[in-house]
């Protein structure tokens, strides 16, 4: 049996999909998705896969490719939050068992890769946040005037899905002055996330701002633990690794307080 579906436009909850074409075939309780193409969020998606109904619990396997997706539009539809922009590309192979949402999430396993071209985070300036933390802990302030938001370098990362969590492996990006490496996980059900962000000054010889001078003296990665929720309107809460910052922190009471906060 073979079925083809061709739709000019499909309205979903909060967004629209256009130019939808799907080709299904079935044989001996296996439904094959030969192709599913659609335009969405300013880009397009290609999906192939199958559903195996030969056992008591159905098993599904999908290969998902997203191309040139407008990240701001997608996040606004999913989380009502559009503070991150860029052009998203993603390849993901995923498999799961069952038919209800809870079983699908709990059994999902997969892997893939993601890249974002010209990423922009409008909520905070990451360099300013890092400088504020380092200079405050060192008992001084940065006099630099900072632009709003953070324009990042093109980023890439490896993805893994397991037990209801989306794990991000070795996300690599950076700003004008700082290299950034990040890894962590997002709980798909609660949308809570926690990441370890490591920042390193690119070229200490160009460290003109006081906070960058402090970083250049350390000449090592500065780790931050960041926590938040993808549905929240506020930016993530990030705490620096007190042991690494060690010599920068002059106030013992403040150091002890930050240790307690970072352990919460």
What are these regions (language model features)?
Residues 99-108, 142-264:
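Extended terminal
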Residues 1-26:
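Elongated, acidic membrane-bridging lipid-handling scaffolds
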Residues 81, 127-134:
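Flexible, surface-exposed loop regions and adjacent strand-edge segments
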Residues 5-9, 31-36, 166-171:
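Transmembrane beta-strand segments that form the barrel wall of outer-membrane beta-barrel proteins
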Residues 122-130, 207-212:
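Outer-membrane beta-barrel and related beta-rich outer-membrane complex signature
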Residues 1-3, 25-30, 67-76, 160-165, ...:
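Flexible, solvent-exposed coil segments and beta strand-coil junctions
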Residues 15-23, 38-48, 67-99, 105-111, ...:
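Amphipathic hydrophobic-ligand
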